[in-house]
Structures are given as structure tokens and as C-alpha cells.
Amino acid sequence: MARHETSFPEILDVAALRARCDFIASAHAEQREPMRRALLAAFKEANVAGRAKARELLAADGAGIKCAERISWLQDQLITLLHDFVLNQVFDAAKAPEASRIAVTAVGGYGRGTLAPGSDIDLLFLLPAKKAVWAEPAIEFMLYILWDLGFKVGHATRTIEECIRLSRADMTIRTAILECRYVCGSAALANELETRFDHEIVRNTGPEFIAAKLAERDERHRKAGDTRYLVEPNVKEGKGGLRDLHTLFWISKYFYRVKDSADLVKLGVLSKQEYKLFQKAEDFLWAVRCHMHFLTGKAEERLSFDIQREIAEALGYHDHPGLSAVERFMKHYFLVAKDVGDLTRIFCSALEDQQAKDTPGITGVISRFRNRVRKIAGTLDFVDDGGRIALAGTDVFKRDPVNLMRLFHIADINGLEFHPAALKQVTRSLGLITPHLRENEEANRLFLSILTSRRNPELILRRMNEAGVLGRFIPEFGKIVSMMQFNMYHHYTVDEHLLRSVDVLSRIERGLEEEAHPLTAMLMPGIEDREALYVAVLLHDIAKGRPEDHSVAGAKVARKLCPRFRLTPKQTEMVVWLVEEHLTMSMVAQTRDLNDRKTIVDFAERVQSLERLKMLLILTVCDIRAVGPGVWNGWKGQLLRTLYYETELLLSGGFSELSRKERAKHAAHMLEEALADWPKKERQAYVRLHYQPYLLTVALEEQVRHAGFIREADRAGRTLATMVRTHDFHAITEITVLSPDHPRLLTVIAGACAAAGANIVGAQIHTTSDGRALDTILVNREFSVAEDETRRAASIGKLIEDVLSGRKRLPEVIASRTRVKKRSRAFTVTPEVTISNTLSNKFTVIEVEGLDRTGLLSEVTAVLSDLSLDIASAHITTFGEKVIDTFYVTDLVGSKITSENRQMNIAARLKAVLAGEVDEARERMPSGIIAPTPVSRVPHGSKTTKAET
């Protein structure tokens, strides 16, 4: 067990601090408490100065490992000086016999000789078999000093015998002792532990340790999110992070008995180039981690949005066209994480080969060693090695580079996993993927077969991407490998998103998504050209990170690649169109009024055919589903289905005002029949309350619930009432509000929801013929248990009633809730306002875009009301930190807003609100609107609002 081989005198003048300790001892020889305070002050000063110097040097040289070593060395010196002071000055044990002395050793990450600024200090105090009476009090004194210095100290006090016994049964303790490093005290005691541990624990238990460490790694990945491409990665514990490199080192030290990772080159486990990759990856990850700890002042391991921009700046990244500095930094991070995955695969391959030679027949998590090798029908280049495809020879790829594609194709059609040695050879053969191979007809045929496989194409494509083949074979794809988008909407890197999109498509086709996506599941078997659809799904975001709009640029990439994949001109045109329009259906569904005929007509003109409509719907579903957890919900699906059905009617010639009136008449009849237990006159009068949009867009089951709700409120004489219901599948909660209509009603309801901490994800807002509003507000679900969520919804409903009735004043309740979300501070969204009179025949359409915040919808609608605008429908769409709100409005007499001066005033007022400036409209929010005279509405008869998160 060796101390640090390198000294860092620039971090700490050890001699000067030792002299100061001696002075403190002599000055306070008989006064323990003053001595303790003086010692604490001296150590605190030295620690602060040393760490500040380490931070300064990190900023200057960018050397991550060196920074971690400097801090570890500093810690060693402080502990050594503390140990010597305590034994010599406090307990007078300096002359104690060697046999009674203790040893202080570092374990865990500190034991490796590296320490992050905010990390725990893990210590193992070794006691001799016959401990001295002063041993434990001395250890306790040291620990209290370290704690008072602000260190988080993990510690254990054991004899060597206890260490050996516990490490046999506990793999965590075994790993800690494996990394044990002598710091101070009895070197003989530390060396004895090392020798006994090596002989009694490590010897002949390699496979057991390897299996446990790899199983532990898999479980860690599962908990952290089993992808290295989460856009807020855990630098320490995440996939492709430092812990993965540490696991390789633990196994190396345990199995190969190496002291340094450089020894792996001598053993032939890693090539010189791979070892350099190991060093670069480790140094980069350490630099990131140290900067994170210094910046946050704590052991922050998640590279969150809040700090990514500052870390990028600290590491010297700059903006480039199409990619910001933070996006360039994060792309580098994910490429390094991918390198760690490559190294893990190469290492496990070498490990398996070594174990197969040494101990044939061992089985475990790492592999099935040397199962019987079998031939694979139709090929002489590959074999089946225990259910994994392996190479039949060392020159398989060099002899025929197309075999780089055949490997993955044969694995797919035979349902085989991949032997790590085969993937290692793939990584080492990437130079064979040349322009000639990219144009090879057979190679492209094999790739298209893999992409459109009816088995599990995402799995094979993922292996190709991890091995580096996908980015080499399709250079345009290589450009977006590991690329992140600096926003809260996208959860994964671009390449990860595309692979997940293909997986969603495959699952839909295999019938695994019928419950979640009934319409797409029904349409998929009838798709005429599944090849074009799969290619479009893979390519839809391939041009991200370019200065040009990625949909337009992506269409150009698709036009270039499709002929290479041997798609026909007709297929190519379909793919090009799908890529260029891949955002259209989502944006129309979420930001436009689907009850406005011009919305459907304009969308149908862009789509032009039923086949395009079907394929665009499926692509849209795949795209949204693959963005990340919680982005898709049933409400979003309902919007897309509505847009699909309305457009399908128009494209098939069935859409007309007459058919719409007939459908509304039929819906009214169905509602009347559903209320058959009501007196005839009462049910007829009730049905006459509702306009066409309500009858056509609200499900009959909901209409019946509303009928009971309104009837009960009327009988109780309540002009204001609320009703709540939770939806497990949609992951939303409904709050239905019955109230007298009012121009500011949406403002007040949205404000009350914001004040209650509820995030609006959708709304269905309708006006009845007797001047009342029937609004169903949809909010994100917070609790998994229905009873808890119902209670929460009821409290929100109560707050809405209190605000509407004037019992509580809206500005005050909003003010208490409008603290800016911490995560949102990391982002900037330029406020934009667009006013159009061409998107609707009846209404002026106002679209606002800005940084989301609590109460924003309430503020925006307050401004619109203050400007004497009547909101016919509103569509609130949130993409992470960015909100896009669209309002269909008229003036108070039902006309469009055509005056340029008035449009400019509207835009200016809205931009001010989006920018967070105080607007007088907010101060004029009504205290309550329960008793106003009903306002006459524009003749469309019903307001509708959509919102999404």
C-alpha cells in the first residue's frame, strides 16, 4: 500500500503547517480546548487555501485527474499531520511500541488517490490485535476535527482479522479493501492487511468478484436510467460515467492483479490506442466532476441544465453555427460516455477469453464461457458461440468489408446476441467503412433489411451505433451521434431519440401498442410502403444542429440518402415529404383550433393524400413518444385522432358543413336518448343549451356526466360549481367548472390553477346558450394513488371557486406562487408574437412564444381581455421550458383585428408580459366574477381550449 508518488507543494507547504502545529502544541500545552480551536483554525485555513489553489490550477491546465490527485494529496497531508499531532501532543503515544500502533488508510475513491472537491472521505482505521487504551479515543479526536472542518467522513475501525472476515461475506467491504491505500501510522499493519487480503480473499475468487461487480453495474445503470444518453447525466453513477471506469479498474486489479491501469497494455487487454482513450475519458470526466463540485459547493454528481452552461464556459467551449457552446460540450460528454462503453466491451471480451483459458466451464453474469460453437446456416464467416454471433476467423472484415453489415444482419435473422470479441473487432475495423462500402449495393440492401426488420430493429441498430458502425456507414447520422439539445423538452441525445422512434414504430407494427395507440395500430397493417416509413422515422431529425431549419435540411439529406438505400423515386419523394413535414401534424393538433374548418382545409392541402396522412400520423406518434418519459399522454393522442379523422373526411370527400350539421344533429339525438330517465321537456331543454362544437368534440359519456353536474347545480341554486375526476391512463386530472360566462373567465381559472401549483395540460371550454361557461380544465397528475389525487383536485377546485366568488383575490394568491423555477433560469426563450388573419376565416389568430413560468397563461389572457379582445379558443402548448400559446380572437363585436396600429399595440403588450415585465392588466384582475351580467358572445357559440405539456 503506497502513499501518493507525487507531491504537490504548490497546494500546501507541509513543513510550514507542521511548524504551526508544533507552535500550537507548545502555546497551549496544558489547555486542550484552546489547543483544539487553534488546531482547527490552522487546518481550516490550509484546507481552504489548498482547494482554492487546486481550483485555480484546474482552470489553468484543465487536467481533471491531476486536480483530483491534488485534492487527495492535500487530504493525505492534513490527515497525516492531524494523526501525528493527536498521537504526539494530545495522547502522548509517540513512543508507543510498534505492535500497539494504529494505521490510517484511505478506501473508496480516496483509496485510488483521487478525490473530488465535495466527495466523502472514506477512512479505515486499522487496529492491532491488542489495541492500546488510547487508540479509540485518538481516532475519535481525529474524526471530530475532520467533521468540524466540514468534511463528510465515512469511517470504519477494525482489526485485520475483522477486515478479512467481513470481506468474505460483503462485496462492498471487499471492494473497499481492494482499494485500500496507506496514509499514515503503522505501515506494517497496512502491509499485513494487503498481503492477507491478497492471499485469503482475492486468490481463486476472480469469477465471483467479476460477476458481482458487473451485476452491480447493471443495477446501477437501471436505477440511473439505462442509457448513457440522458441529457442530464450522472457523471459518477450514470452509464458511461466514472463508476464504469472504476469498475474496470476494480476488476483489473482483482483479476489481473495490476497496480496501475497502464499495465493492461502490457497484458494485451487494451491496445496503446485504447489505453490512451481510457486516459482521455477518465481525465475529461474528472475535469467535469471537479468543476461541478467547485461550482455548486457540494458533491453534485448530476450534470443538470442549471450548471451545464457554466461548466461549458469553464472548460473553454465556444458557440459554433448550429450548435451553442453548451451543446458542443454535451456532445463531447456523450462521445466520451460512448468511448467508455467501447472500452467496457473490449475489456469484457479480453476478460472472457482469459477466463475461458484459465477456468473453462465457469458461468456467471459476464458470460457463458465456451459453450459449444455451432455453424450458422448460409455463412462461413460467422459462428454461433452459445447464442452469440462470433467471428469464424480474424480476417473476416478485412477480407470482405461488407461483412461488417452481414454480422448485424445475420444476428438479427437468427436472434443472436453479440459476442464481445466480435464487437471489439468491429470497433477496431471501422476504418474499413469507406465511401466505396457506403455505395455498395449489398451493404445498403443489408442495412435496409436491418432497419425494416419485423423482429427488433432498434436493438440491432443500437448495437451498430454503439460499435460506431451506424455513424460511419451514414456520415450524416454520425454528425448527430451524442448531440444534445439544450432544452427541458428533449430527454435524450438526437441519435438516442431516433433509435427510440424506430422502436416505437416497430412495437406499433408488432401489435404491442394497441392500447396506447389504437388508431395507429389499426392503420399500420394497411400502410402501402413500410420501407419508406421506417427510413423517414430514422431520418426525421438527422439534420439537427445545423444553421438551417432541421426539417428542410433533413429533407435534403433524405433526398441524397434514399437512392443510396435503393429506394425508388416514389419512395424517395415520400420520405422527403415526411421528413420535411414531420412537425406539422403535431403543431397543428396542439396549436390550432380543430373546430375551425380552415384549420382542416389548410392541413389537408399540405397532406394531399390519405396515405400521406396515415404515415404522417404514425411518424408523429413515434416522434412524440420517443422524446422522453411523460411527454406523450392520452390527451395529446385525442388531439391527433381528431385532426386525423377530420382531415380523412375532407380528403375522402366526406367533409362538408352539411355533414357537420348532420353529425351535430345526430349527437344531440344521442344525448337526448342517453338522458331517457329525465322528463322529456327537461331533457329537450337541456340539449338545446349546447352548440355544435360541444356536441361534436365531447364524448357522449362526458356529456352525460356534465348533464348530471349542471342539473345538480341548478337544483341547488348554485351559479358556481366544480366537479373533479382523475384519469390513470391519460395521467391527468379533470376539474370541471360551471360559471357565468365572462371575458376574463379563462384568466381567472388559469391564475387559480397556477396559484394552486397545478400545471394546465389541456382544457375544453364551452359556452351554453343561456350564457354560462362549462369549462373542463386538465392538469398534470401529481399523485399515483387515486384518493390522494382526488383530494388534491378538490382543493384546486375549491381555490377556483374562492377566486371566482371573490373570497380570495387573484393577484395576491398568484404572487405567492410565482417564484421562477430554478431549472428555468438556465434557459432563455426570445419572446415572439405572431398575429395572422389568414389562418381562420372568422378569427384573428395570435400566437405567443416565450419562457414558461407559473401564472403566464393568466397574465397573457388578462392582457387580451384588457385590450377588449374576445377569446374564442385558446391552445396552450408547452415544450419543456418553452410555451407556445395560440388564441383565436375577435373584437367585442365579433370582427377580426385588421388595424395595423392595433396589432402592433397587442404585440407590444404581449411581448412585455412574456419578458416578465409588470403589466397593468394584472393589477386590474377581478376579485371575483360570480355575479356579472352575462356578456353576449360571438355567434360561434362555444369556446375551446387545448393545452399540452
UniProtKB/Swiss-Prot annotation:
Its EC number is 2.7.7.59, 3.1.4.-. InterPro entries: ACT-like_dom_sf (IPR045865), ACT_dom (IPR002912), HD/PDEase_dom (IPR003607), HD_domain (IPR006674), NT_sf (IPR043519), PII_UdlTrfase/GS_AdlTrfase (IPR013546), Polymerase_NTP_transf_dom (IPR002934), UTase/UR (IPR010043). Residues 1-377 are annotated as: Uridylyltransferase. Residues 494-610 form the HD domain. One of its GO terms (biological process) is regulation of nitrogen utilization. Residues 734-816, 845-926 form the ACT domain. It comes from the Bacteria. Its cofactor is Mg(2+). Keywords: Hydrolase, Magnesium, Multifunctional enzyme, Nitrogen fixation, Nucleotidyltransferase, Repeat, Transferase. It catalyses: [protein-PII]-L-tyrosine + UTP = [protein-PII]-uridylyl-L-tyrosine + diphosphate; [protein-PII]-uridylyl-L-tyrosine + H2O = [protein-PII]-L-tyrosine + UMP + H(+). CDD domains: ACT_ACR-UUR-like_2, ACT_UUR-like_1, HDc, NT_GlnE_GlnD_like. Residues 378-733 are annotated as: Uridylyl-removing. Uridylyltransferase (UTase) activity is inhibited by glutamine, while glutamine activates uridylyl-removing (UR) activity. Pfam families: ACT, GlnD_UR_UTase, HD, NTP_transf_2. Residues 926-949 are annotated as: Disordered. GO terms for molecular function: [protein-PII] uridylyltransferase activity; phosphoric diester hydrolase activity. SMART domains: HDc. Has four distinct domains: an N-terminal nucleotidyltransferase (NT) domain responsible for UTase activity, a central HD domain that encodes UR activity, and two C-terminal ACT domains that seem to have a role in glutamine sensing. Belongs to the GlnD family. Modifies, by uridylylation and deuridylylation, the PII regulatory proteins (GlnB and homologs), in response to the nitrogen status of the cell that GlnD senses through the glutamine level. Under low glutamine levels, catalyzes the conversion of the PII proteins and UTP to PII-UMP and PPi, while under higher glutamine levels, GlnD hydrolyzes PII-UMP to PII and UMP (deuridylylation). Thus, controls uridylylation state and activity of the PII proteins, and plays an important role in the regulation of nitrogen fixation and metabolism. This is Bifunctional uridylyltransferase/uridylyl-removing enzyme.
